[in-house]
């Protein structure tokens, strides 16, 4: 069996690697579901998948914060010229 190690110890996923991490998670799931792995390898692969999921979650949270900040900055710069989005939809300009 080939053992894979996570070379990214920073806990974050670079933008270009997000899709690669998701693909690796899917591959890990397939290997585990195949039933052909030894139990120790299953645990190692599962631990890797959890680590990748956490990295992807951190990446998505960071991007959401960036988007929120950009929207806030845009709204502050343009004042009420841009309709603000609420949970119900678009609020009319005041």
UniProtKB/Swiss-Prot annotation:
Q: Which InterPro entries match?
A: Exonuc_VII_S, Exonuc_VII_ssu_sf
Q: Is this entry keyworded Glycosyltransferase?
A: no
Which top-level enzyme class is recorded in the Swiss-Prot or TrEMBL entry?
Answer: hydrolase
Q: What Gene Ontology terms describe where this protein resides (cellular component)? A: cytosol; exodeoxyribonuclease VII complex
Q: Known HAMAP family for this protein?
A: Exonuc_7_S
Instruction: Please give the family membership noted in the entry.
Output: Belongs to the XseB family.
Q: What's this protein's name?
A: Exodeoxyribonuclease 7 small subunit
Which NCBIfam families does the record associate with it?
xseB
The lineage is: Bacteria, Bacillati, Cyanobacteriota, Cyanophyceae, Nostocales
State what this protein does: Bidirectionally degrades single-stranded DNA into large acid-insoluble oligonucleotides, which are then degraded further into small acid-soluble oligonucleotides.
Q: What is this enzyme's EC?
A: 3.1.11.6
Q: Where does this chain mainly localize?
A: cytoplasm
Tell me the Pfam families matching this sequence.
Exonuc_VII_S
Q: What are the protein's UniProt keywords?
A: Cytoplasm, Exonuclease, Hydrolase, Nuclease
Biological process annotations from GO: DNA catabolic process
> How does the annotation summarize its subunit structure?
Heterooligomer composed of large and small subunits.
Where is the protein found, in the record's own terms? Cytoplasm
What Gene Ontology terms describe what this protein does at the molecular function level? exodeoxyribonuclease VII activity
Reaction(s) catalyzed by this protein? Exonucleolytic cleavage in either 5'- to 3'- or 3'- to 5'-direction to yield nucleoside 5'-phosphates
Q: Which organism is it from?
A: Trichormus variabilis (strain ATCC 29413 / PCC 7937)
* Source organism superkingdom: Bacteria
């Amino acid at each position: 069996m080939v053992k894979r190690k996570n070379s990214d110890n920073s806990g974050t996923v670079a933008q270009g690697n997000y899709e690669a991490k998701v693909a690796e998670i899917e591959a890990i799931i397939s290997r585990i579901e195949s039933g052909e792995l030894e139990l120790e390898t299953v645990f190692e692969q599962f631990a890797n998948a959890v680590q990748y999921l956490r990295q992807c979650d951190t990446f998505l949270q960071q991007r959401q914060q960036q988007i929120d900040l950009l929207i806030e900055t845009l709204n502050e710069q343009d004042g009420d010229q841009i309709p603000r989005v609420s949970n119900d939809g678009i609020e009319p300009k005041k």
